[in-house]
């Protein structure tokens, strides 16, 4: 484990003074009493601040709404899970038997939460300036690529605005299935749009994420027309 953590620390670009903090950040609540949820809470707040400050300086002419949408894009689950895969965090996670069996080391929500927990752990092990430097390095490519615009809006918002612009009825969303235990549920939602006369399905770790997935499928169809 020590050798593995040394490798991980090289990958994330930070050497812990208190390795126990890193170990805790990698521990899912299904595996132990001392898990990473409190670190995740802290890391989420710090990440939002770091990204908000970076965007504030990078886009001096953008308004609050544009900055908020760009920040949401950069701190959302898929972006964090992508970082986790770059660091191969799935190889280091401590999971309970149930999560191991269900492939929790690949689940985006668990990977994203772990990235936030590591940020929280780094902040406790060092200081805000050091944490900011590390996180900005992780986000170097994303911060260079991101631009304000409609593409920063989430799929549900974009779909609603598209339909409103054409004076069409808004979509309806219904949960059709919930699988798994309370701490690792998967929601399946159907979305119906009257003028298309088709039902689209989406799945996710929450109802909101499932609705977003379904809306994204409809948008892909509309953009092909």
From Swiss-Prot:
Binding site for Mg(2+): 40, 113, 116
DRBM domain segment(s): 154-224
GO biological process, one term: regulation of gene expression
Residue ranges of the TM segments: none
GO cellular component, one term: cytoplasm
A Pfam family reported for this protein in Swiss-Prot or TrEMBL: dsrm
Record-listed E.C. numbers: 3.1.26.3
Protein name: Ribonuclease 3
Source organism of the structure: Pasteurella multocida (strain Pm70)
